[in-house]
Amino acid sequence: QGYYSFNEHVFMANIQSEIYGRRYTYALLMLLEYKYKDKSEWKDFGTTSIEHILPQNPKATSQWVKDFSKEQRSYYTHRIGNLCLIGRRKNSSLGNLDYQEKLKKYFEKNIGSFASSQKIYQTYPNAWTPETVKENQERVIQDLMEIFGIKSPSTIIDESTYMEQQRSVYPNAYQPWTESDDERLVALYNEGKSISELAQMFLRNRGAIKSRIRKLTGERF
């Protein structure tokens, strides 16, 4: 209680949400790294980035689009179970490769120092699918609960429940963007509308707005 009180319900809600881009995401991934790594090998990692396994903007012809529905990509992309640490600055062109190619050309060269990242690729050497990312998300949540001494889950939110919640708040959630939507979104963003204002105008959550702007303009948040 008091200054150092810890609200388990808020924490559980946060770590199950779209966590990428939040200030504490890197700290949580480093806590997982500390849990998995031999402490005698702990060192300064130097340049470190957070990478999406399922990429943020996969090509329409990619295996990612075949394996994941649009709703599944929207749900999983920015969650902690789809994130890992790499020992270099991100490379967008390599980051969008299909899983097997990405593993060989990108990750095998850049995750050598990270036990937490190695664990993912040793556990899932063949494919990254909705089933495997869900399984990894559940494992990571359980590991974080152990790290923070949470004995039983406050609330575990599954994919279908989350989508229902989103649609009840944002009626356009998971609906396709039209060409006119895109033009209007970019125009309003360039006029200086905030992400929160755009979310209200387009009846979509802030993550969806940021993701669409990123795809249309290359803007990084």
Residue ranges: model-predicted function:
Residues 1-59, 76-80:
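Aromatic-lined ligand-binding clefts that engage carbohydrates, nucleic acids, or primary amines
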Residues 5, 21, 74-79, 83-160:
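Long, cytosolic, alpha-helical-rich C-terminal regions that act as interaction/scaffolding modules
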